[in-house]
Amino acid sequence: MKRILFTAGGCLFYLLLAVKAYAYDCSATPAYQDGVNYQSGDLVSNTGAAYRCNVAGWCSTGGAYAPGTGWAWTEAWDELGSCDGGAGSSGSSSSSSSSSSSSSGSSSSSSGSGSSSGGTSCDGIEAWQVASIYTEGNVVQQNGERYIANWWNQGQSPEDNSGAYEVWSAAGSCSGAGSSSSSSGGTSSSGSSSSGVSSSGGSSGGDSPIARHGKLHVCGNGLCNADNVPVQLRGMSTHGLQWYGWGNCITGNSLDTLAEDWNADILRVSLYVQEGGYETDPAGYTAQVSHIIDEVTARGMYVLVDWHQLDPGDPNANLDNARQFFTDIAQAHGDKTNIIYDVANEPNNVSWDAIQRYAMEVIPVIRQYAPDAVVLVGTHGWASLGISDGGSAQDIFNNPVTIDNIMYTFHFYAASHGQVYRDELRSALERGMPVFVTEWGSQTYTGDDGNDFVSTQAYLDLLDQYQISWTNWNYSDDFRTGAVWNTGTCSADSWGVGNLKEAGAWVRDKIRNR
């Protein structure tokens, strides 16, 4: 069955969370209704519990923020306790659970301590084990308390890692000691779980990309690790989150596959601004990006947050939205060492000087909360260093972004972009430009048609020569040849190599074999 956090996976999560911290008189508390314009301080009842609105805009959004059921509800509401009967309008507020209200919206973790007055039996719930692997929804007990895993983890004690933005959620006290066998438990290091995770895989413990390289910084043409050794990251890009995001092609199982089987270093998270993307639901899409960041981080990979502006091509048209989005994401995740930010996907039909002005406006927003983060700037001509718009890399050399620790992006589709584009890229690299290839394909610029692996290999050889990091487009089952998975793979949540398209098998090999 496909794992969707806010449906199948969410049911388990919130059902088990139904053991509330304290009783609350809901007789005068109105029932929650989707679509109502709730204000901060408003009280509602839902799923047998009382809640108080904490962030007005998100309380009114519904869906992911519906109290007690949405996967990001803890970002909008404080839980006041279990209803001891009834539902109606204005009950008094007792102490709230400590759910975080960061403006970014993020993970599904609950922050309350969840200890009930009498407790619930923990018979059949296994004790947490340091060597076991746990995935979303797994339930354990530790020192008389129950906990639910929010995402993949190993060796992270529930007692020390539960709460908002943590890998575990507290789910109440145990009334009994409990036994050590349960179908909801994790996987021992010698076995395999239902999601196919094994502790011997590349992303666990000290063998993950983050563990190997630590915090990255720009050096020369590319990236260096914490020891100042050049690093080339190889990985994948999502398709648009509005079509193929969390719960569709991006699931716990698909990320396990990317980390454990493909041995990828990085996932680019592509948030479209238009085309049904961010501007239609800023809070919802911010929460989705934030949750994916947590999921990818838990698997030991780097995350490239991609502000996927495309049409209009001038990034300044989305300047206010960009400021808000990057404020929210950087504020929530600025303390992480594995986040790279791309402030403009493919600027087009706009001068480099206009892009440079935009970058000088947006990068300080990120640096306010993530002062050492690597930031990428999209180049003109659909990230072609200007070639596709009649410009060149010289435009960038004439007016560079005068902020440290930044890189410029280059995109190619090998069946469309031949030697002229490679020559311009090589020239820019020879002159010392720091470059990250955040999107490429072996097809035409439409992401479709036949694969030109000869031209593609010529590009990859050049990137290897200069240790240039890259992410391939795209990790979905879209019908086009550039999507790595066959149509239907995502709905089946089955990620074996037999489901790969020709280009998918090819790029998997390039990621695995260095």
Curated annotation (Swiss-Prot):
It comes from Microbulbifer sp. (strain ALW1). PROSITE patterns: GLYCOSYL_HYDROL_F5. Endoglucanase that exhibits highest activity toward barley beta-glucan, lower activity toward carboxymethyl cellulose (CMC-Na), and marginal activity toward laminarin and xylan. Optimum temperature is 50 degrees Celsius with CMC-Na as substrate. Thermostable: retains 59% of its residual activity after exposure to 70 degrees Celsius for 30 minutes and 49% of its activity after exposure to 80 degrees Celsius for 30 minutes. PANTHER family: ENDO-BETA-1,4-GLUCANASE A, GLYCOSIDE HYDROLASE FAMILY 5 DOMAIN-CONTAINING PROTEIN. Its EC number is 3.2.1.4. The keyword Aminoacyl-tRNA synthetase does not apply. GO terms for biological process: polysaccharide catabolic process. One of its GO terms (cellular component) is extracellular region. Exhibits strong halostability and halotolerance. The activity increases about tenfold in the presence of 0.5 M NaCl, and about fivefold in the presence of 4.0 M NaCl. Tolerates detergents, but activity is decreased in the presence of EDTA. Activity is enhanced in the presence of Mn(2+), Ca(2+), Ba(2+) or Mg(2+), and decreased in the presence of Zn(2+), Cu(2+), Al(3+) or Fe(3+). The halophilic feature and the tolerance to a broad range of pH and surfactants would favor the industrial application of MaCel5A in diverse environments. It holds the Pfam family Cellulase. Keywords: Carbohydrate metabolism, Glycosidase, Hydrolase, Signal. SUPFAM superfamilies: (Trans)glycosidases, Carbohydrate binding domain. CDD domains: ChiC_BD. Residues 1-23 form the signal peptide. Optimum pH is 6.0. Is relatively stable between pH 5.0 and 11.0. This is Endoglucanase MaCel5A. It is an enzyme of class 3 (hydrolase). The keyword Hydrolase applies. It catalyses: Endohydrolysis of (1->4)-beta-D-glucosidic linkages in cellulose, lichenin and cereal beta-D-glucans. Residues 91-114, 179-201 have a biased composition (Low complexity).
